[in-house]
Structures are given as C-alpha cells and as structure tokens.
From Swiss-Prot:
Molecular function terms from GO: ATP binding; ATP hydrolysis activity; DNA binding; DNA helicase activity; zinc ion binding
Name of protein: Maternal DNA replication licensing factor mcm6
Family assignment from sequence similarity: Belongs to the MCM family.
Taxonomic lineage of the native organism: Eukaryota, Metazoa, Chordata, Craniata, Vertebrata
Domain MCM as annotated: residue spans: 347-554
Gene Ontology process terms (BP): cell cycle DNA replication; DNA replication initiation; regulation of DNA-templated DNA replication initiation
Keyword Hydrolase in annotation: yes
Zn finger spans (C4-type): 159-186
Length: 821
C-alpha cells in the first residue's frame, strides 16, 4: 500500500467524486453483508441488538469482533487489516446503512466502527512508518490524559469573494481550508470563512502511553506515543491504566515545530547585511522544506480495552465485579483449581512459599506481604468519609537481607505495580505533576508513581533516603488515598488507591538493638503511624541459618529453575487472588469483642511504660487490626471475620509493634559499687582460712563479677518484676490489709532463690540486685507505689529517722498496671 493512498482517496473524494475507489466500495458492500448475516451459536444475529442501541442519541459506535470477520470472510479481514485507513470511512457508511434498517435515525448523525479482539499485538518500540495506515493493536500504560475537546472533522466553508459554499472539506489533522473556490469564475484561494453550523465536529481526546516495565529492554528508556481517541472512545482510559488500543498509525503535523519554524522565518527575514542584502543567503537544496516538513507519528485508536481484563489490567478491582462473574469468566479446569485451593487446609503456608520461592526464611514478612495483596474491605461512612482497605507494609533491615527482592517479586507478580526508588523520586514524580501541553499550551496533569499504581501496589525502595518535603507529599495518599493538586490554575483531587510496600535501611547501616525502632529509622512519626505492619530484618551470625541461606543461593545458581519449588503456579495465585478479592467479609459479634479486647491489650502495654513500643499505639493500629483480619477472611474465601482471623492478625501486628529488641537493664553504680566491694571483702576476711589462701589476682577477678551483678538482660528484669508483682497480688488477695515492706519483699525473694545461692558473696550480690530492681520498679517504671507508715499514723508519730522511714516503706502494686502474659 502506498503511503499517499489514504490521503489521495480522501482528497479526490471531496473534490466532487472525480475518482471512485472501487476497493473501498467493495469493502463497504461486503461489510454491510457481514453485519446483516453474521450469526452466533444460537442462530441469532450478533449485531442487531448492538445496532438498535445506536438509535439512542448518546451512542454512535458499533463494536465489531475482528475474529468474527475472519471467520466470515478472510479476504475482507485481510483488506481491512492492510488498507484500514483507506477503507475506514466506507466501513462507517456501512454501519450507518445497517443502523437505519433498525430504526428511525437523524440524517446528519455520524456513525463509527470499532474493532475488538484483534489478534496480533505490536510493541511501541516496533512502530515504524512501514505500518502507517494498517490496523494494529498496541498496549501500554497511560501516563498523561488531556481534556476532551471538539474536533473539526469535516468543514463547510463560505467564499468571501463570491459567497459560494464549499461543503465537506476533510480536515487533515489540522485546520485545512479549500485549495480553491469551486466557482469556475472565482479564483479565490485564501479568503474563506468556516460555517460552524453546517460543519461536523466530534469529541476528541489525546492521551499519552508509554512502554510497561515488562516490555522494556534492560537499561533502555521507555518509549511513549500519543493516542488520539474519538467519539465514544474518549474518557475510557485513565492515568495509570494498562490498556490495549486498536487502530492505525498516522502521520500528523508537528504543530510546535511548525510554530517554531514560523518564528525563525519572521526573525530571520529582518536580519540584513550591511548593504541591505539578506545575510543568511541561499541555503541550497539541503535545507529546502525542512521548516515545513515537520511531522510526527501518532496512533489513531478506534477501540480501548483492558490489558488482560480477566486476571489483571484495569479490571483488577472493579466495583461491579462479583465472585459469580469472575467464576463465569473461568474455564472448568481453572474453576476446579480455585475451588481446590480454597479447600486447602495449609493454604496460608503454600501461598507464601509459592509466591516467594527464591527467598529463604522470613516467613513473617511473606505472610504480611501476602495479606497486603488480598487487602481489607474499603468502606464509606454515612458522612461520605472513605476508610481505606489497602494495607501498607514497611520492611526495615540491614543490607543484604533480601528487602529489595520482596519488592521486585511483588512488582513482577502484581498486574498493576510500580517500582521506584525514594532517593531518585521527587514529590511530583511520586504524586502527580502539572505540565504544559506543547500544542494547546494548556496545563495538564501527568501521573506520578502513586497514580500509576492506582488499584495496585507501589513499591518504594530506599524509603528512608527520601527528602522530608517528598515524604510529606505522600501523607494524604497513604491515609485518605487521594492526591490533591492546586498549582498553575489546576485544582484537582485524584485517586491513589494503592498499597505501599516500602523498604528502608536503619540509621548508620546497622540496626542497633539498644535503640527502639523510631530511633533506628529516619522516618517521621506521621509516616510511621500510616504503616500497618513494620518488619525488622537483622543480619545475625547463626551457623544453621547461614548454612541454609548459602545452600539455597548456590542451589539457585547451579540448577536455577529446577531448584524452585512451587505448590501453586503464579497464574493460579493471580486467579485465586482476583476471585478472593471479590468477597466483602463482615465482622461477627464474637470477632468484634475479640478485636476490642486485643486493642485494649495493645494500649495497656503501651501505657504501662515497661514494654518498648516501636511507636505510639493509636486508633490507626485498631484500623490496621481490622484490615488484617478482613484480609485473612478474604484469603480463606469467607463471608465473615472469625476470631481465628483476628488472632493471626493480632499476632502479626504484635510482632510489628511490640517485639522491639530492648537493651540490658543497667543499674546506677557510683558509690553503691564501693559499698558492694567493701561488703564482699569483709565477707572474704571473715572466712578465715579462705582469706589466707586468696592470692592477689582473685580480688581483680571479683570486680567484673561485681559489675556484672549490677547489670541484667531485659528478659531477666521482666521475669523478676513479674515474680514480685504476682507475689504482692496474691498476698493482697489473701489479706485485705496486707502491708508488705521492701525488707519483706527482699527476704521473700532471697528465700525463693535459696537453692541458687551457695556463698555469702552471692547472697550479698543477690540482695543488692533485688533492692536495685525494686528501686527501679518504684522510681522509673512506676509499677510499684511506696507508702510510709508515718503517713498512716498520726502526725505526732511522723518524726522518724530517714533510715527508719526507708525500712518502713509499704509497697503496693499500681492499680493501672496489668500483668503481661
């Protein structure tokens, strides 16, 4: 096919039918016969009901399945494919004739045809001038959408010299006037005015798509192409959608380049030499027409569809989908597999191992990421406030602990996932940017990573390296799931219904156990509270673990595919995920009470001051507990949230919030250390013969043991404190007016530890240690409250020595303290 074919045909057609295109007329006749005769399996006409819909004023496009044309007439299908741009106007006339048979239609109404299910698909990178005018299908991700405008497709002009009317002047993607007045006497070529009442306009929208990461060659920059949508195809593709576009490649004038060329011509004409001659001179044939021949490729689409609409694309989380409709889209074998998975008693574990087969261990993170993919149930309150259902997860860990591997796995698995790096991304790149269009000079919105991941997952690596101003930009997106923009005269609120999976490194590169999580990560408190789950990965030296990891990595390098063991394939998991996400589980009465009880426990732990939380427990953690419980119910295809689902959600949340490594408890040493040393030395001297046999090295060796006695692990400290509190509570239950003093508590503890004490030195150290523990419980943790006996007596008996007052301390347990399990 010659490139000038379509343009020539159009031009001669408008110039008074001087040339008759027999090929197009034949295609029009065959296509009309196809519409009238094409029948389905039940014997009824496939396109009669669709044509009857065209009677409605808002409908003007008939969608035709291309495989039906191939089945009906292969030669017709080949001609449409190879000469699409040439025969398209005639196909539209055939649709108009077919629609008029169905009902009364206005004479001036235009109709269009769109082709779906075109078999072959081209990559954006493979588009070339050889494919201009042929029927193609391309796919990509929408990154920019322009507002809808009216486009002049056929103009009626009035000659300003002789008042003659020139009808149906086809517009070649720019404002095109008649070449000459049709009146033989009039020689006007330039002075025409457009009659808008008799001209034809159509809805027109431009969108820009770019290559997806899956199609992109390694290390290459994504290519983009502009898509032109008309009629009913407008507003069908939103920013972030992955769509298939069926249409043809066309050549359009580059308006911006033409405008720049005109400007250069105007300025260049004014520059003259010293004697009045043009200093530019004659450029020769090399530059001839360069300014005027500025064209670029664009794609004129007639049909827009979702990429893989069954198990991915933009239909992943459509609200109108139900479990029944998803089931109807599956084959019998696919449905049997989904049903088999739903009955699997070990489904939780099998999904985790199948989803991350190359990552050894880290089972808790696998469970958390899996629940993130299933997600909770989004809700809308009576006031119209939206409550998010998406789960946000953050992984904090030392280098080389497979953080980025989790993000890469999710990006490859999820049909709508965006991977980005925090340091290399700006606030506009993460949310949305307002840019100026090159042609219309209007401001349009270009989607950022969070908008592109709408109804999907946004994986952000190096999350802690983001600048503070960029972190603030995603506050709204993480909680309200919207992005508000007010700049350059554009005010908009855009959807960002995405789950965020972030990976961050600790401050200094290594996670310090002596500090809490909030001191280990360079993140603000508002950002941390918006994450539902935090996971900590510490690179520990463990012989068994190191051997298992090394064996796994060597296995992957040596045998590659053979070493990967999956219970379910990726396609099975995607299918099951799509089916399970259609469930909207409700919280039962038992689960509701259990959730309230677990949240009370979390708040109580946070308020007790003993357990070191990673951050403050707020209502957001309660909402996280609800979302995780709903996700567990969805995973098991349950319509109700049961207490067992809440239990697993609480376990994951507890690991994330409470289980923060705590440092050893160090007691103040100072002068107390000297007193301990004196008592130890006196005890050794009183032992007689043992003191005589002691050499000079032994006192030096005793010092470390003394120092070690004033320091203990947090677990030991918690064990002793729980033991003391339990004893006091039991004594209070037995005797209502129980007055336990510090001395009573010390003596009771030493009696309990009697079997472990062998020497007098150990007795003195144990006594000093328990006194320090009681002192800390009173003054720092406020678990115990001290009362002096003098406060219980009359004021006259209050004159006592400080030593007597110390001995007379009465201890009671703080009524607000709850003993941990």
């Amino acid at each position: 096919m010659e490139l000038g074919g379509p343009a020539t045909a159009g031009a001669t057609d408008t110039a008074g039918q001087l040339f008759k295109d027999e090929l197009s007329d034949k295609c029009q006749k065959l296509f009309l016969e196809f519409l009238e005769e094409c029948k389905g399996k039940d014997g009824s006409n496939l396109y009669v009901s669709a044509a009857e819909e065209l009677v409605r004023p808002e409908r003007n496009t008939l969608v035709v399945n291309f495989t039906d044309i191939e089945y009906y007439n292969q030669q017709l299908a080949t001609t449409i494919q190879e000469e699409y741009y040439r025969v398209y106007p005639h196909l539209c006339r055939a649709v108009r004739s077919f629609a008029r048979q169905m009902g009364n239609i206005p004479a001036n109404k235009e109709f269009y045809v769109a082709f779906s299910d075109f078999p072959a698909r081209q990559k954006i990178r493979e588009l070339s001038s050889a494919k201009i005018g042929t029927l193609l299908r391309i796919s990509g991700q929408v990154v920019r959408t322009h507002p809808v405008h009216p486009e002049l497709v056929s103009g009626t002009f009035l000659c300003m010299d002789c008042q003659s009317v020139v009808k149906d002047v086809e517009q070649q993607f720019r404002y095109t006037q008649p070449t000459i007045c049709k009146n033989p006497v009039c020689a006007n070529r330039r002075r025409f005015t457009l009659d808008t009442n008799k001209s034809r306009f159509v809805d027109f929208q431009k969108v820009r798509i770019q290559e997806t990461q899956a199609e992109l060659p390694r290390g290459a920059i994504p290519r983009s192409v502009e898509i032109i949508l008309r009629a009913e195809a407008v507003e069908t593709a939103m920013a972030g959608d992955r769509c298939d576009f069926t249409g043809t490649l066309i050549v359009v004038p580059d308006i911006s380049a033409l405008a720049a060329g005109d400007a250069r011509m105007e300025t260049g004409a004014k520059v003259t030499g010293g004697e009045g001659f043009n200093s530019e001179g004659v450029q020769g044939l090399k530059a001839l027409g360069v300014r005027d021949l500025s064209y670029r490729l664009a794609f004129l689409a007639c049909h827009v569809g979702a990429t893989n609409p069954r198990f991915g694309g933009k239909d992943l989380r459509e609200e109108d989908q139900t479990a029944e409709s998803i089931k109807n889209q599956m084959t019998v074998q696919e449905w049997e597999k989904v049903f088999e998975m739903s009955q699997d008693k070990n489904l939780y574990h099998n999904l985790c191992t199948s989803l991350f087969p190359t990552i050894h261990g880290n089972d808790e993170i696998k469970r958390g990421v899996l629940l993130m993919l299933f997600g909770g149930v989004p809700k809308t309150t009576m006031e119209g406030t939206s409550l998010r259902g998406d789960i946000n997860v953050c992984i904090v860990g030392d280098p080389s602990t497979s953080k980025s591997q989790f993000l890469k796995h999710v990006e490859e698995f999820s049909p709508r996932a965006v991977y980005t790096s925090g340091k290399a991304s700006s606030a506009a790149g993460l949310t949305a940017a307002v840019v100026k269009d090159e042609e219309s000079h209007e401001f349009v919105i270009e989607a950022g990573a969070l908008m592109l991941a709408d109804n999907g997952v946004c994986c952000i690596d190096e999350f802690d390296k983001m600048d503070l101003k960029d972190q603030v930009a995603i506050h709204e997106a993480m909680e309200q799931q919207t992005i508000s923009i007010t700049k350059a005269g554009v005010k908009a609120t855009l959807n960002a219904r995405t789950s965020i999976l972030a990976a961050a490194n600790p401050v200094g590169g290594r996670y310090e156990r002596s500090k809490s999580l909030k001191h280990n990560v360079n993140l603000s408190a508002p950002i941390m509270s918006r994450f539902d789950l935090f996971f900590i990965l510490v690179d520990e030296c463990n012989e068994v673990t190191d051997y298992a990891i090394a064996r796994r990595i060597v296995d992957l390098h040596a045998r590659n595919e053979e070493s990967i063991e999956r219970v379910y394939s990726i396609e099975d998991i995607q299918r099951y995920l799509l089916f399970a996400r259609q469930f909207q589980p409700k919280i039962t009465k038992e689960a509701e009470e259990f959730i309230v009880e677990q949240y009370r426990r979390l708040r109580q732990r946070d308020g007790s001051g003993v357990a070191k939380s990673s951050w403050r427990i707020t209502v957001r953690q309660l909402e996280s507990l609800i979302r995780l419980s709903e996700s567990m119910a969805r995973m098991h295809c349950s319509d109700e949230v049961q207490p067992k689902h809440v239990k697993e959600a609480f376990r994951l949340l507890s690991k994330s919030i409470i289980r923060v490594d705590t440092p050893d408890v160090s007691f103040d040493q100072g002068e107390d250390e000297k007193n301990v040393e004196e008592e130890v030395n006196n005890a050794n001297l009183n032992n007689g013969e043992e003191a005589m046999e002691t050499n000079q090295d032994e006192p030096i060796n005793d010092k470390p043991s003394t120092n070690a006695g004033l320091k203990m692990s947090f677990a030991e400290y918690k064990q002793i404190s729980n033991l003391l509190v339990l004893h006091m509570q039991k004594m209070e239950e037995v005797e209502e007016e129980c007055h336990l003093t510090t001395t009573d508590l010390v003596n009771w503890y030493l009696k309990e530890m009697e079997a472990e004490i062998e020497t007098e030195t150990e007795l003195i150290l144990k006594k000093r240690l328990i006194e320090k523990v009681i002192h800390r419980l009173i003054n720092y943790d406020h678990i115990l409250i001290e009362l002096n006996k003098s406060e219980l007596k009359t004021m006259d008996d209050s004159k006592e020595t400080s030593e007597d007052a110390a001995e007379d301390r009465i201890l009671v347990v703080n009524p607000n303290y709850m003993l941990e399990d």
